[in-house]
Swiss-Prot record:
CC terms in the record's Gene Ontology section: host cell cytoplasm; host cell nucleolus
Motif (Nuclear export signal and binding to XPO1): 73-84
Consequence recorded when altering L81A: Complete loss of Rev export
Location of region: Disordered: 23-49, 92-116
Protein name: Protein Rev
Domain notes: The RNA-binding motif binds to the RRE, a 240 bp stem-and-loop structure present in incompletely spliced viral pre-mRNAs. This region also contains the NLS which mediates nuclear localization via KPNB1 binding and, when the N-terminal sequence is present, nucleolar targeting. These overlapping functions prevent Rev bound to RRE from undesirable return to the nucleus. When Rev binds the RRE, the NLS becomes masked while the NES remains accessible. The leucine-rich NES mediates binding to human XPO1.
Function, as annotated: Escorts unspliced or incompletely spliced viral pre-mRNAs (late transcripts) out of the nucleus of infected cells. These pre-mRNAs carry a recognition sequence called Rev responsive element (RRE) located in the env gene, that is not present in fully spliced viral mRNAs (early transcripts). This function is essential since most viral proteins are translated from unspliced or partially spliced pre-mRNAs which cannot exit the nucleus by the pathway used by fully processed cellular mRNAs. Rev itself is translated from a fully spliced mRNA that readily exits the nucleus.
Transport as UniProt keyword: yes
Organism phylogeny: Viruses, Riboviria, Pararnavirae, Artverviricota, Revtraviricetes
An annotated GO BP: viral process
Single GO MF annotation: RNA binding
Region of interest (Homomultimerization), ranges: 18-26
Family: Belongs to the HIV-1 REV protein family.
Gene name of the encoded protein: rev
Keywords: AIDS, Host cytoplasm, Host nucleus, Host-virus interaction, Methylation, mRNA transport, Phosphoprotein, RNA-binding, Transport
């Protein structure tokens, strides 16, 4: 693995092998039996899958030395965010992504119930 020392590569491979073993130890449920029995087996299987997933995250965070959770992104207050489609709307699917328009004064969306 590029940019890593050999020792951490071995640790990472060991962690991946362990996680692979955990997932292989929980095969999908047998499709035989009554509807209720199949439903119960699927429910228990999904719960085990969730447990394996959380254990896998803990293993990776231990071996990689960092949190599995992403760093929270600081956003401005929702009241100040608006979609501005005045210039070149629809020309590109990614145009304007990443730079939200911020209004100094937020417009009134709902009036007090009177029609104009």
């Amino acid at each position: 693995m590029a940019g890593r020392s050999g020792d951490s590569d071995e640790d990472l491979l060991k962690a991946v092998r362990l996680i692979k073993f955990l997932y292989q130890s929980n095969p999908p449920p047998n499709p035989e039996g009554t509807r209720q029995a199949r439903r119960n087996r699927r429910r228990r299987w999904r719960e085990r899958q969730r447990q394996i997933h959380s254990i896998s995250e803990r293993i990776l965070s231990t071996y990689l030395g960092r949190s599995a959770e992403p760093v929270p992104l600081q956003l401005p207050p929702l009241e100040r965010l608006t979609l501005d489609c005045n210039e070149d709307c629809g020309t590109s699917g990614t145009q304007g992504v990443g730079s939200p328009q911020i209004l100094v004064e937020s417009p009134t969306v709902l009036e007090s119930g009177t029609k104009e």
